[in-house]
Amino acid sequence: MEARERGSMSSSIGNSAELEGNLTLSDRLKVFKGSTFDPDAYVTSKCQRMNEKETRHLSSYLVELKKASAEEMRKSVYANYAAFIRTSKEISALEGQLLSMRNLLSAQAALVHGLADGVHISSLCADDADDLRDEDLYDMDNKQLSNIENWVVEFFDRLEVLLAEKRVEESMAALEEGRRVAVEAHEKRTLSPTTLLSLNNAIKEKRQELADQLAEAISQPSTRGGELRSAVLSLKKLGDGSRAHTLLLRSYERRLQANIQSLRASNTSYGVAFAAALSQLVFSTIAQAASDSQAVVGEDPAYTSELVTWAVKQAESFALLLKRHTLASSAAAGSLRVTAECVQLCASHCSSLESRGLALSPVLLKHFRPGVEQALTGNLKRIEQSSAALAASDDWSLSYTPTGSRASSTTPTAPHLKLSISAQRFNSMVQEFLEDAGPLDEALQLDGIALDGVLQVFNSYVDLLINALPGSAENEENPVHRIVKVAETESQQTALLVNALLLADELIPRSASRILPQGTSQSTPRRGSSDRQNRPEQREWKKKLQRSVDRLRDSFCRQHALELIFTEEGEVRLSSEIYILMDETTEEPEWFPSPIFQELFAKLTRIAMIVSDMFVGRERFATILLMRLTETVILWISDDQSFWEEMETGDKPLGPLGLQQFYLDMEFVMIFASQGRYLSRNLHQVIKNIIARAVEAVSATGLDPYSTLPEEEWFAEVAQIAIKMLMGKGNFGGHGERDVTSPSVSSAKSYTSN
């Protein structure tokens, strides 16, 4: 019971890849969004009966889900960022208008209260006015007014001088002093409302004058470094932080544009060096702007949003410039290495900004991806064309891969592997392609485009190998589809299989390991490597490579089977007449396997010797090849309707002698396939079914087939003698107890003598 529950749990966890394929990200995240979600209970329910492997699997699934969620959130933020910034600016503008309105209302309220207090004081003092002498009152008021007026006059004179001399710090201190005096005058009512309002307006005008002066200084190209930061900070202290931040970013933008113009003027070519210098210039400028922004305005969300918008704009301009001058030309020429180096440099510089909260990779991805895909397509097309040209002159002889090329130095071929000329070149081109495409796939998140392209060109190369087989259906239907040198001999034809197998089974996966999902490397521990090798994406990609090899193997088997079954003129050699006509003779036949099955045995023996030399360390593939070739011939007999119609319902049905010969032929196939260790269960069952059908055909004529057929040991003994004869290890005189001669003995003697 416990084992069944554990298996159920493992199955549910193991289907995470299936869930990813059937559910959207939002659906998979619903379980975590509920108000009743309990993390501890969720983890406990998943891990209660899980072993170590299942726990690692769940952990890996949750990590991938976390990454997918973060990426989805990032895409959503960037997709709606412009609207968010636009709304944020509108809200900020509205807040500013509300603040101005509040200040205006406060000033008006102060004026009204001041007027009301003045009227009230006048009414209270009306009765005592006669007690004061007019000249004394005038002297007292004049003394107070003269003191304040003198201070105001001196204040504005001093402020004018400070502004004219552009002494920013002292000007700001003076403005602060004036503000403080105005506040005290308002609180102590030492100034009339009209005078106080005039003083405030004058201070506001001077403050605006200083702000304009600072803005002009910030806009000057010569203002840089500490002077720039100081001016921006001063403008922010004056209450115009939004303007200060905008001017700071504009200053960096003007400086960046000027530096880009100088860089373009000093470069005669727009290659990797230009891309590296341009990338360094742009992203270092963005980094410096971000640093100054944080130093001046801090982490205020409003300013951070403006910085992000500005950085995205600069990154887009940079991407378009690099795309127009470098990537477009290299992509059109199919120069994947130049494209890869440029993109890798840009991605490296871009990633350095992520620590500052600026993730600009999606911007580069949007603009670089079309050009990169064009470069990938151009390289893949070049690989196809070069492979086809080499296949036209390949003699299909195997040799060790030469060393010294860029591909062989980075991904060395195992010394025991031999390939033909076209396969060697195909392998080196694929290695170079994947070496260049690896950084692109990682930087631009190409979702396996490079691997799909490799699979495509490998399928095309396998098509070339299929066309190299004699009598290939592709060549017959479309002779000009591919001009390929035909593999005439069995060794050459087997070499075609070696090319495909070694490429699909070892060389291409080794080259692709750097960009396969969590690809393995030689430095990783064995256990981790094994876990990654079992990833569904990697296994599925390798299965697709193997299916192409299977296509070639099936074509190989079909071609050799057709050589046995049909003559060059297209006539059928393996027909029912071989067995039906045996009962028309009056003499006892000399029992021996039919010539066509002798040829099948000889062909399989030759191919077995060839594959034993060529498929060293890959005996399983060699066994499957021999198994499939034998099955192809036997299945043709099983499925040929005309063969069975003549045997079962023809004018001359199958007789006992023909049945015995047919039985012997099938037993012969089973024995030599069993001895060669390529007798599959399927082949064994098909042969048994064929024999049973032939026996039923004889029974349908009213004869008892078992009364004429020898014992099974007889068939096995004759088949064994035939095998020895055909291999040159026996002779007919060595078995005198039975007459095992047949009409086919002469062909056997001819075969062994040759």
UniProtKB/Swiss-Prot annotation:
Region entry Disordered, spans: 514-540, 734-754
A Pfam short name: Exo84_C
Record flagged with keyword Lipid biosynthesis: no
Q: Give the record's keywords alphabetically.
A: Exocytosis, Transport
GO BP: any one term: exocytosis
InterPro entries per the record? Cullin_repeat-like_dom_sf, Exo84, Exo84_C, Exo84_C_1, Exo84_C_2
Q: One GO CC annotation, please?
A: exocyst
Its family remark reads: Belongs to the EXO84 family.
Oligomer status and interactors: The exocyst complex is composed of SEC3, SEC5, SEC6, SEC8, SEC10, EXO70A1 and EXO84.
Function, as annotated, reads:
Component of the exocyst complex involved in the docking of exocytic vesicles with fusion sites on the plasma membrane during regulated or polarized secretion. Involved in polarized cell growth and organ morphogenesis. During cytokinesis, involved in cell plate initiation, cell plate maturation and formation of new primary cell wall.
Q: What is this protein called?
A: Exocyst complex component EXO84A
Could you tell me which species this protein originates from? Arabidopsis thaliana
